[in-house]
């Protein structure tokens, strides 16, 4: 929002010595983001005056039309004699008032004016156009001032506002009121403690009858709707110089007087307006949602397919506006429009925001509606617009007014007195809290030690006690909060769960994984790309009421989509050998959860019943660990060829992560989307006599890889870390043996379809309690083992706690392990 300081002074009794820089500092201290302070016209100097054209002589014999003019500049040239000036513009005549730069003047860009001979005549100055003076972009020729604007010789720089200080403010989504001069002026008045003149406070007509017929189909989409009309408007009436200048300083292009007035009122009051040529309307207006198949050609000449979520303005011919976003082409103001209808409305912010994103139309109107506009200002804004149309365009204001009011009074916020002080750690007197809240427009009623605060209609962002505390604190000054280090309460350090999570993060990082933090949002398309069955529990997700992206309206039930997208981004930037992991929450809705979670108070501790109600509404949020691997885990080099990351690495990573918690995973072959059905492992933990599923790991299905654009043979894992932590709760420290380890290697030949995990499980069972670990270190397929067969080589580590194992004992354990594998999987010891 660009704010000219001179315009601001019309509403705020600023000290004369207040500078734009000082003003910016004040606003920054109030929490507004002033990005720049622009000194427009700072490079303009010298005599720039009003002149009257006395004579015009057409010069011939040149390649383009040239005129030699004599111009009365009063006493500005020191002689009182007319000034001779060469000019090529054709849009002025004898007797017109113009702007003249005399010799010695410097125009924007360092363009110095001097007397010089040109086209055979002495030119002593320049008759200026708007663009040459930096007023606005204009290719219509020089400025012709209205009659009576000023006497010849009068300094024009102040009259035209050539020098101006402009604040450029970045308005955050919660500060919609700051997208207007009215809103900024109120903040400035509070900062300086001076009087504020509200431009919205003006005499308003009491009657609201006889206006253009209109209706609102659903009060939820439009809480207030106002129409006011004028007749006899002069479409040739120009936009006055002062209005064009202000619009330009605010970054708005001048179009025509009628359209410029709607933009001017929007900048002044913060209420977007729309103007129609009334002769193009067909019957009553209705505000409603779009119907399937409806289309509208908007002002940018694009035919748009409308969504049932779009709010429309319609007449008997169909849609004429996308409400709050852009008007339709068929009813726009034309060069011949004489009867004009002005619309001022309060549309639902969420609908406008979704429509703007859906159609990729971000307008000045939609920016204000989606941040929230004043619910009570519509009649004042429409009245201001028709008054300007009458004053500047010669129109006649119609008596009839359309005013549909479905607004609901805001409920007061009940807050304990002194709440702001408790939040800031500063002892604010109750009187100060009340004064500051009233300063921002709140109505405050004190009842004992509580305050009932009703926020003003222009502050939809004030919804709870903490919002009110912020208003008190920022107006008292953040800089006045003492910088005291808080006293840390005594504690026991990190919890066991926090220590485990940090430890597993370090372990994965040590193994070459990079941690990523992804947004927890997914869409139905992600579930389709994962090839999840229609009845898969992961498709049942929490839907957001106001998603950041309409394509991702759900909270994730799995970490994998985010990891896949992060992998694709990194591969696209040249990181072909990469391993990523994420530790985060997934969200599963409770079957019996209420439709809407309650909002708990912030100025007191919630009751047990309130906490229970909130807990019941929240989804289950287990913590998962996910990882994805692609490319080579060991790169090739002078030491030899590289080794690709495989499904076995994914399984091994999951086992290493679980081992941090002292939990050993049990690996079983499985078929589970999105993994390859022949290269997927289900991961279990032992819970007494039963096994609890905690996750899956393996190589991804080729169609999933193709759907996401992943590198071929990408592997992934996802485990439920909460379940692993629970399994670790009863874990005890293992007994450490001081006796040497004995190793035995066995190579077993099995059918190619037999999972290695089943062979490993059989070896563990057969070896018994003296087996310390078993590791698969080689897989071989080839002529030596026969077609349809494979050789699996395992390293067995054996150790006793009370003795050194003998050769006979280790051989006996090895034989028992091989026998168990042969019985369960048909394994044969390879010779």
UniProtKB/Swiss-Prot annotation:
Catalytic reactions of this protein: tRNA(Phe) + L-phenylalanine + ATP = L-phenylalanyl-tRNA(Phe) + AMP + diphosphate + H(+)
One of the Pfam families matching this protein, by short name: FDX-ACB
Main localization of the protein described in the UniProt heading: cytoplasm
Keywords linked to the UniProt accession: Aminoacyl-tRNA synthetase, ATP-binding, Cytoplasm, Ligase, Magnesium, Metal-binding, Nucleotide-binding, Protein biosynthesis, RNA-binding, tRNA-binding
Highest taxon, organism lineage: Bacteria
GO BP term, example: phenylalanyl-tRNA aminoacylation
Cysteines paired by S-S bonds: none
Protein name (Swiss-Prot/TrEMBL): Phenylalanine--tRNA ligase beta subunit
Biological source species: Thermobifida fusca (strain YX)
Gene: pheT
């Amino acid at each position: 929002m660009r704010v000219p300081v001179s315009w601001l002074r019309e509403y705020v009794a600023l000290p004369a010595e207040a500078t734009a820089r000082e003003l910016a500092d004040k606003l920054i201290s109030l929490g507004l983001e002033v990005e720049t302070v622009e000194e427009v016209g700072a490079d303009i100097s010298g005599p720039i005056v009003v002149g009257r054209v006395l004579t015009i002589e057409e010069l011939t014999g040149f390649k383009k039309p040239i005129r030699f003019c004599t111009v009365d500049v009063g006493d500005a040239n020191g002689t009182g004699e007319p000034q001779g000036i060469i000019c090529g513009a054709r849009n002025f005549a004898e007797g017109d008032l113009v702007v003249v730069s005399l010799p010695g003047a410097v125009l924007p860009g360092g363009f110095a004016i001097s007397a010089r001979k040109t086209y055979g005549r002495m030119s002593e100055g320049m008759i200026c156009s708007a663009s040459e003076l930096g007023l606005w972009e204009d290719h219509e020729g020089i400025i012709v001032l209205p009659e009576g604007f000023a006497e010849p010789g009068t300094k024009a720089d102040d009259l035209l506002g050539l020098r101006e200080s402009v604040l450029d403010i970045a308005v955050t989504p919660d500060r919609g009121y700051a997208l207007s001069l009215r809103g900024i002026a109120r903040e400035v008045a509070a900062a300086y403690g001076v009087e504020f003149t509200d431009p919205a406070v003006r005499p308003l007509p009491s009657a609201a009858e006889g206006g253009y017929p209109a209706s609102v189909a659903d009060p939820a989409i439009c809480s207030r709707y106002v129409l006011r009309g004028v007749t006899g408007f002069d479409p040739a009436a120009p936009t006055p110089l002062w209005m064009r200048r202000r619009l330009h300083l605010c970054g708005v292009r001048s179009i025509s007087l009628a359209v410029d007035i709607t933009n001017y009122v929007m900048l002044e009051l913060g209420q977007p307006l729309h103007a129609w040529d009334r002769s193009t309307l067909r019957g009553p207006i209705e505000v409603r949602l779009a119907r399937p198949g409806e289309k509208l050609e908007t002002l940018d000449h694009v035919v748009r397919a409308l969504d049932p979520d779009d709010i429309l303005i319609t007449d008997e011919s169909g849609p004429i506006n996308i409400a709050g976003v852009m008007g339709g082409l068929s009813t726009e103001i034309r060069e011949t429009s004489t009867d004009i209808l002005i619309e001022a409305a309060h549309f639902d912010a969420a609908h406008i925001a979704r429509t703007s994103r859906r159609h990729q139309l971000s307008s000045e109107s939609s920016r204000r509606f989606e941040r929230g506009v004043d619910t009570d200002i519509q009649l004042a804004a429409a009245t201001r617009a028709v008054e300007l149309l009458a004053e500047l365009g010669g129109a006649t204001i119609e008596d009839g007014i359309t005013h549909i009011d479905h607004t609901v009074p805001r409920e007061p916020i009940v807050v304990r007195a002194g709440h702001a002080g408790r939040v800031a750690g500063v002892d604010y007197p109750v009187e100060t809290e009340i004064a500051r809240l009233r300063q921002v427009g709140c109505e405050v009623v004190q009842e004992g030690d509580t305050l009932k605060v009703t926020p003003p209609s222009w502050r939809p962002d004030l919804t709870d006690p903490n919002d009110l505390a912020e208003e008190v604190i920022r107006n008292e000054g953040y800089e006045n909060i003492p910088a005291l280090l808080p006293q840390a309460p005594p504690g026991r350090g990190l919890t066991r769960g926090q220590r485990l999570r940090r430890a597993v993060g370090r372990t994965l990082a040590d193994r070459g994984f990079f941690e990523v933090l992804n947004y927890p949002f997914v869409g139905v398309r992600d579930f389709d790309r994962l090839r999840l069955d229609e009845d898969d529990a992961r498709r049942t997700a929490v839907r957001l009421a106001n998603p950041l992206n309409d394509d991702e309206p759900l909270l994730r039930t799995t970490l994998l989509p985010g990891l896949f997208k992060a992998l694709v981004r990194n591969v696209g930037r040249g990181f072909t050998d990469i391993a990523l992991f994420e530790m985060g929450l997934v969200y599963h809705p409770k079957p019996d959860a209420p439709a809407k979670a309650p909002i708990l108070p912030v100025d007191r501790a919630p009751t047990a019943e309130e906490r229970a109600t909130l807990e019941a509404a929240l989804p289950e949020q287990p913590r998962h660990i996910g990882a994805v691997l692609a490319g080579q885990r060991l790169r090739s080099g002078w030491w030899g060829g590289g080794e690709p990351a495989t499904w076995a690495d994914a399984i091994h990573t999951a086992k290493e992560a679980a081992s941090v918690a002292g939990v050993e995973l049990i690996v079983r072959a499985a078929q589970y989307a999105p993994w390859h059905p022949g290269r997927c492992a289900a991961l279990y933990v032992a819970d007494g006599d039963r096994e609890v599923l905690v996750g899956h790991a393996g190589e991804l299905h080729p169609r999933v890889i193709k759907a996401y654009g992943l590198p071929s043979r990408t592997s992934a894992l996802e485990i439920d870390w909460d379940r692993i932590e629970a399994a670790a709760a009863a874990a005890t420290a293992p007994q450490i043996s001081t006796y040497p380890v004995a190793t035995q290697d066995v190579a077993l030949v099995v059918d190619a379809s037999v999972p290695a995990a089943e062979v490993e499980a059989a070896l563990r069972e057969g070896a018994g309690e003296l087996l310390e670990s078993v590791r698969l270190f080689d897989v071989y397929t080839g002529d030596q083992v026969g077609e349809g067969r494979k050789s699996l080589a395992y390293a067995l580590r054996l150790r006793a706690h009370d003795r050194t194992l003998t050769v006979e004992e280790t051989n006996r354990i090895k034989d028992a392990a091989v026998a168990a594998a042969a019985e369960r999987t048909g394994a044969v010891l390879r010779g």
